[in-house]
């Protein structure tokens, strides 16, 4: 985890809900990619789910809210699965079987459907010269998936250039263990970790983990599933940008 050869840039800090931020690290799943609805939808339609792909976007966050409410760890997706299939309209009498099908289908490699709005926000941050990177619980695939999906890559490429993509499988430590964030912070030399935001979609993994690491946790909560929470929430990654920033579509 040696310091990367990046210059210390003097960039006006972002101000997010009153907090000055000099760099931003992100989760990957639920932030830039979600389980591909083109894969999941046909499987769940067999059990009565709707075909509207937008509902599968909402279903992911319903699932994550249920998972967080249960305090489930990284390996327990049972609450996520049930909330997901309910959200896409599977009748109650078929939810158990549909949730089992989802569980056996939702592998690491179908977390590949890019969220265009999030990618646009990431590009805007890059163009503002805000140091950015990714820290994700994954299985060794996330750097390739993000690049192949046109989201981001380290250095030049078709996606947004980022400083680092940390994969928990590769580094051998996973959220909510705060040590994983040290790998991302290693390329942010000269920046106080208290002025580094971490944006994720899980209270248990992302908010608790990054808070323990001394970062500023921010939850992406597009459907306001966590009203009254004691941490910062945004409905879109575009909310990270100054109001005068033009959209990047």
Model segments located where?
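Asp-based, Mg2+/Mn2+-dependent phosphohydrolase catalytic module
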Residues: 1-26, 93-95, 119, 123, ...
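N-terminal helical cap/lid subdomain that shapes the substrate entry/recognition surface
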Residues: 3-128, 140, 144
